């Protein structure tokens, strides 16, 4: 099963195309109902590979934030907050973990070029599986809740300020 969780309309179009063109395995598209903005550099090739860099900080990155779907935008906002603390976070959109992990090592290293200890995954779901990609994982390892989106983001620690705070605590030194 090829699971794809796109972050914007371009990634969604690419995911749909890949699903329709696939002759060897089924595809699950995990879409949001949120009205999300458009990434500046989303690409078919990035979705095809499973992951690619979508945001570069103002100075050389010393950490990478890896996210899927709507969390990509939360990571971009958190990255901008982190710059004030001199933590420079590059953001990677990983719409398809399945596609990414089967790439040759040299292709994976082009995307995840920083050391394992400098990577953080951000996923509004289980952190299960992310340990193979990132040392630090921000997720929800409990049952969800019902309510307004803004209230739930705050409750589970997924506002950009809360994400930036967690990341800062990982890299205190």
Language model: regions and residue ranges:
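Mobile "lid/hinge" segments at catalytic clefts and subdomain interfaces of large enzymes
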Residues: 1-2
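A short helix-loop
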Residues: 5
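Thiamine diphosphate
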Residues: 12-15, 19-173
């Amino acid at each position: 099963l090829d699971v794809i969780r796109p972050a914007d309309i371009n990634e969604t179009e690419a995911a749909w195309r890949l699903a329709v063109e696939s002759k060897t395995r089924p595809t699950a598209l995990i879409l949001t109902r949120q009205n999300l903005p458009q990434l500046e550099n989303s690409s078919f090739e990035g979705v095809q590979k499973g992951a690619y860099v979508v945001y570069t900080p103002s100075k050389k990155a010393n950490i990478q934030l890896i996210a899927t779907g709507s969390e990509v935008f939360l990571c971009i906002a958190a990255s901008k907050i982190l710059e004030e603390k001199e933590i420079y976070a590059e953001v990677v959109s990983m719409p398809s973990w399945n596609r990414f992990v089967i790439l040759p090592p040299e292709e994976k290293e082009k995307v995840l070029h920083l050391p394992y200890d400098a990577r953080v995954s951000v996923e509004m779901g289980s952190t299960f599986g992310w340990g193979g990609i990132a040392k630090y994982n921000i997720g929800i390892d409990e049952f969800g809740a019902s309510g307004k989106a803004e209230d739930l983001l705050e409750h589970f620690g997924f506002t950009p300020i809360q994400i930036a705070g967690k990341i800062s605590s990982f890299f205190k030194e």
